[in-house]
UniProtKB/Swiss-Prot annotation:
The protein, known as: Non-homologous end joining protein Ku
HAMAP family reported in the protein's UniProt record: Prokaryotic_Ku
Quaternary structure, from the entry: Homodimer. Interacts with LigD in the absence of DSBs, and with the isolated Pol domain of LigD in the presence of DNA. Interacts with Sir2, possibly in a trimeric complex with LigD.
Keyword Aminoacyl-tRNA synthetase (UniProt): no
Assigned GO CC terms: DNA helicase complex
Keywords in alphabetical order: DNA damage, DNA recombination, DNA repair, DNA-binding
Function: With LigD forms a non-homologous end joining (NHEJ) repair enzyme. Binds linear dsDNA with 5'- and 3'-overhangs but not closed circular dsDNA nor ssDNA. One dimer binds for every 30 bp. Recruits and stimulates the ligase activity of LigD but not of T4 ligase or a human ligase complex (LIG4/XRCC4). Attenuates the 3'- to 5'-exonuclease activity of LigD. Stimulates the template-directed addition of dNTPs by LigD on 5'-overhangs and nuclease activity on 3'-overhangs.
Superkingdom of this protein's organism: Bacteria
Keyword Coiled coil: no
Boundaries of every Ku domain copy: 10-193
GO BP annotations, alphabetical order: DNA recombination; double-strand break repair via nonhomologous end joining; positive regulation of ligase activity
Molecular-function GO term, any one: protein homodimerization activity
Family: Belongs to the prokaryotic Ku family.
C-alpha cells in the first residue's frame, strides 16, 4: 500500500505521527466503452466552448459559478494558501461513546500506521480507545476537503490498528420525507410475535466471510467463457463490422461513379494518329 497522507494526531499535549492509507478497494469489474459497430475504443475529448479547441489536461483550470452566473477562477496557489490546506494535523475534538455515531454518517475508511521509530504514543492512544469503548471525533484536511472523522481502534487478530472513518457533514444527509410513515398503523400482537419468531430463527453472529459478491463472480465466469471461446480481440486488431449487413445501394452508387469517372478519363485521352 502507498500512503496518501502523512501528519500527526494531536492528542492533548501528545502528537502521534501517522501515515494514512486507504482501507478499502473496489472489486467491481471495469469495462471499456466501445463502438458497437466495430469494437473500436471510445475516446472523450475536452473541448472548450469558447474557442472550440481540444484542451490538454495540463491546460485545465477550475472556476466557480455563482447563482447569478458570475464566475471566478480558483488556482492551485489559491487552494494551497488556505490555512486548513496547509495543516498536517488530525485534531482530536472530543471522545464520544462508540454507539453515538450513526453508521449513516460513515463515508470512507482509512488505516493509520505509526510514522516514527517508536510506536509507543500510537499504542497508548489505541489501547485507551479500546478500553474506554470510545471514538475520537477528529478534524483534518485531506485532498482539498475539510473532513470530520471518527478515529477508532480495530482488532485484526494479530494487531490492533487505528482507523479513521470520514463522516458526512449534517447538511450532506437528506431528510427522509415519507408522509406515508406518519400514518398510524395497527400491528396485532400475534403478528409481532410471529415476526419475532422469524427473526429468532434467522439469528446468527455476523461473519462477512460467508458472503460473496455473486454478481461479480458470475460476470467473471461470463468473461472467462468468452475469452476461452475465441470471442476475444485486442486493441491492435483492425476494427471489423459485427453482423451488420452491407449497404448494397451505397456500394453500387460508388461503383457507378467509378465507372463514369473512368469512362470520362478514357474519352479525354487523344486518339493516336
Amino acid at each position: 500500500m502507498r500512503a496518501i497522507w502523512t501528519g500527526s494526531i494531536a492528542f492533548g499535549l501528545v502528537n502521534v505521527p501517522v501515515k494514512v492509507y486507504s482501507a478499502t478497494a473496489d472489486h467491481d469489474i471495469r469495462f471499456h466503452q466501445v463502438h458497437a459497430k466495430d469494437n473500436g475504443r471510445i475516446r472523450y475529448k475536452r473541448v472548450c466552448e469558447a474557442c472550440g479547441e481540444v484542451v490538454d489536461y495540463r491546460d485545465l483550470a477550475r472556476a466557480y459559478e455563482s447563482g447569478d452566473g458570475q464566475m471566478v477562477a480558483i488556482t492551485d496557489d489559491d487552494i494551497a494558501s488556505l490555512p486548513e490546506e496547509r495543516s498536517r494535523e488530525i485534531e482530536v475534538l472530543e471522545f464520544v461513546p462508540a454507539a453515538d455515531v450513526d453508521p449513516m454518517m460513515f463515508d470512507r475508511s482509512y488505516f493509520l500506521e505509526p510514522d516514527s521509530k517508536s510506536s509507543k504514543s500510537y499504542v497508548l492512544l489505541a489501547k485507551t480507545l479500546a478500553e474506554t469503548d470510545r471514538m475520537a471525533i477528529v478534524h483534518f484536511t485531506l485532498r482539498n476537503k475539510t473532513r470530520l472523522a471518527a478515529l477508532r481502534v480495530k482488532d485484526f487478530g494479530k494487531r490492533e490498528v487505528m482507523m479513521v472513518h470520514t463522516l458526512l457533514w449534517p447538511d450532506e444527509i437528506r431528510d427522509p420525507d415519507f408522509p406515508v410513515l406518519d400514518q398510524k398503523v395497527e400491528i396485532k400482537p400475534a403478528e409481532l410475535k410471529m415476526a419475532g419468531q422469524v427473526v429468532d430463527s434467522m439469528a446468527d453472529d455476523f461473519n462477512p466471510d460467508r458472503y460473496h459478491d455473486t454478481y461479480q463472480e458470475q460476470l467473471q465466469e461470463l468473461i472467462d467463457t468468452k475469452l476461452e471461446g475465441g470471442q476475444a480481440f485486442t486493441a491492435e486488431d483492425q476494427p471489423r463490422l459485427l453482423d451488420e449487413p452491407e449497404d448494397v445501394s451505397d456500394l453500387l452508387a460508388k461503383l457507378e461513379a467509378s465507372v463514369k469517372a473512368r469512362s470520362k478519363a478514357n474519352s479525354n485521352v487523344p486518339t493516336p494518329p
